[in-house]
Amino acid sequence: DAQTAIFRTHRDLALILIGFWQAFRSDELSRITVENVAADRNVGMTIYLSHSKTDRDAAGTTYDLHSLKAYCPVSAYLDWLQVSGLTSGVVFRSINRWGQLAETGIHRQSIDHILNRVSRALFPNEPKFSTHSLRRGFTDWAVRAGWDMKMLMDHVGWLSMDSARKYMPVRKDFGALALNNQGGAVFNGMPDPASGLTLLGHLQNKQAE
């Protein structure tokens, strides 16, 4: 059904981009509500969650995302609201074969299914994706972009360096001998095919076709 395809495309893109850029867990993505998001296409968006794994005092956390020139989570979110007509309640919902939205939020275990359905359409070898892939992919991107540990921990919400290090790629510096010769940073091993960073690149290429 055409309506189902349109809904899924916009929902999936918003889910992937928000999940990637904020390094959200599936539980966090499944609990985002329209009432707790403020978005301006030209500025950015804030997302409030009443609790999360790292919010030990259950005081609630507000996350900030900037509007971007490419892979923009803000535009993807606003486009999804416009297409779906959602004005309240949970943002990410299941969609049946007739293009009807569920009243309740998508189950967190279904998010991995969505990521892998998208990957099957993009990759011939069908690597397995999860929200862990998005978190690792964002960390890959941030390290390549020059973020330090403090910036990463503050953005993602990690409370300890040990938690952050689990997601950080190993870097080796060969200086001027490195072919890329851009600071000499070379990552240990080939890029993980199931990295969220790889998924974003293929999504962008698909949109350009």
Predicted feature locations:
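Conserved catalytic core of the tyrosine transesterase superfamily
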Residues: D1-T131, W141-M151, W158-T198, H202, ...
